């Protein structure tokens, strides 16, 4: 690594070298421990230190900071690229507080996600944080369209999706899929959310989020 770049990084920054000259910088600390040296478990149950993010393009922007309760109190709200420092679990909870009738009900979103993670563990036997990360990686789109105007006429043009927007869309679609499943349905939203995450992690076509990703990439492919 360039010595000048190394001096600018914080002490908690993790750098992974995929190949000579190809490095991935993960600025969100993952080696935080309790005062007695034991790992900090999410919801008091799940260890995030062993979670693997398979997509190198998302690794720098997907924060897996060990926290008992993922709640940053909006401290990164007005910072440039502050979303990258918000734990991905908290961002999922924030999406569950939509639409407006659920605004501010973070404890409700916390209980929904906590119960959904318990269901995922019972159904798969795996760390639900790893299953959720795999689901986000699978759902994140790589290509979309934008409008370019030439001579007063708008043309759709295919463009690559930035990593921050990829995460935004993936989390939003997973939350939308859970809400759509539980609407006018006796199944609770916790079960619907768990099933949506499991289906997305397994690349199951039954996943609402995967269908949205495929639709976006299909439209983008026709606009190349």
UniProtKB/Swiss-Prot annotation:
Coiled coil: none annotated. Keywords: Ribonucleoprotein, Ribosomal protein, RNA-binding, rRNA-binding. GO terms for biological process: translation. GO terms for cellular component: small ribosomal subunit. One of its GO terms (molecular function) is structural constituent of ribosome. Gene3D superfamilies: Ribosomal protein S7 domain (1.10.455.10). It holds the Pfam family Ribosomal_S7. The keyword Cell inner membrane does not apply. The keyword RNA-binding applies. One of the primary rRNA binding proteins, it binds directly to 16S rRNA where it nucleates assembly of the head domain of the 30S subunit. Is located at the subunit interface close to the decoding center. Belongs to the universal ribosomal protein uS7 family. Part of the 30S ribosomal subunit. PANTHER family: RIBOSOMAL PROTEIN S7 (PTHR11205). HAMAP family: Ribosomal_uS7_A. This is Small ribosomal subunit protein uS7. The gene is rps7.
